[in-house]
From Swiss-Prot:
One of its GO terms (cellular component) is plasma membrane. The chain crosses the membrane at residues 6-26, 37-57, 63-83, 118-138, 155-175, 181-201, 207-227, 228-248, 341-361, 378-398, 410-430. Pfam families: WzyE. The gene is wzyE. One of its GO terms (biological process) is enterobacterial common antigen biosynthetic process. This is Probable ECA polymerase. Signal peptide: none annotated. Keywords: Cell inner membrane, Cell membrane, Membrane, Transmembrane, Transmembrane helix. The lineage of its organism: Bacteria, Pseudomonadati, Pseudomonadota, Gammaproteobacteria, Enterobacterales. Belongs to the WzyE family.
Amino acid sequence: MSLMQFSGLLVVWLLSTLFIATLTWFEFRRVRFNFNVFFSLLFLLTFFFGFPLTSVLVFRFDVGVAPPEILLQALLSAACFYGVYYVTYKTRLRKRVVDVPRKPLFTMNRVETHLTWVILMGIALVSVAIFFMHNGFLLFRLHSYSQIFSSEVSGVALKRFFYFFIPAMLVVYFLRQDSKAWLFFLVSTVAFGLLTYMIVGGTRANIIIAFAIFLFIGIIRGWISLWMLAAAGVLGIVGMFWLALKRYGLNVSGDEAFYTFLYLTRDTFSPWENLALLLQNYHNIDFQGLAPIVRDFYVFIPTWLWPGRPSIVLNSANYFTWEVLNNHSGLAISPTLIGSLVVMGGALFIPLGAIVVGLIIKWFDWLYELGNREPNRYKAAILHSFCFGAIFNMIVLAREGLDSFVSRVVFFLVVFGASLLVAKLLFWLFDSAGLIHKRTTSLPQAQMDGKL
């Protein structure tokens, strides 16, 4: 890459970043937080944060990258995607009407809400315990990270249930919403994330998600300023780098440490070069249509229920890894959101996917606002827990693609909804047995309340 070519890419990168950052800043000033703000920051991180890191790798360490014209296509496709997404998100197809009273879809009381978070926590803890009994601490047993996907590890499907510890702790926080509950959420979820990191053998997702949710709650409540958020972001990047070194068993120093930091940070937070690789091999792609979305559900179907289930799931990530890159190392390489759309339908699917994503984020914001307006604090805690719990799925959307997002959000919805139903069933059984007693306020306290 020549200096002139880099200068052209830098101009496009600066304009694109300024365009998205400006819209995000105005939205942040308007509402402080919604899922449009979160997705916009996530989109910036995924598709634009890595450009400076790539530039240093190219000019400092002479690392090979895709041709400049392909990198330009990747930057422009990301900017155009966001433009279509933003217009879709902001467009109203009908006038906003004043909310009229309507019969709620469901209600929650104190006992049902506490039962819900206990069930969600139980799902996570039991899954971790069973996985540990089968495999022990994989971080200290396996020699390479790719081994966690091999036949040496049993009960891999249980990992999908670990994440429900975070929504459980979110319910606990939203029932109180004070600084102590906020700090308890951080300590409990990060401790659980570190435990699963050691048991699973290097999976950092639970730690990243817990820390991100903690920061966004702090921003919403005004407990964290923007400079504190920036400092926490730097701390998070360094922490994830250290965990990555432990995961891959790397011992580096000097220039090698700096080089390792650059490429691991880029691959962890901003795999934008994967989109460039896809575009570089565009002529080799056999467009998959909507099949990757259907195939991604295969992993949630147990073999005892479907004995003939394919052992290899050809979703967009695996298609990109195996068919496009011819990489059979055992690790799936993230195609990114835009990359998954290219795999499914080429360039035509990029604006269509942007419209779909705009509607998805709009729906989550509608649900979040519903929770903000809900007078029943127990129901509000459940709605907010569901919305913030889905942040993991939004990260999957940006990094892994639309197909992975759809299967995971459906799985999350089913498990979360089933936990609600079981909680309501248990409440009905306990109430029928006379075990539920309404809280009564003592007379002196009632008199004191009246005086106040």
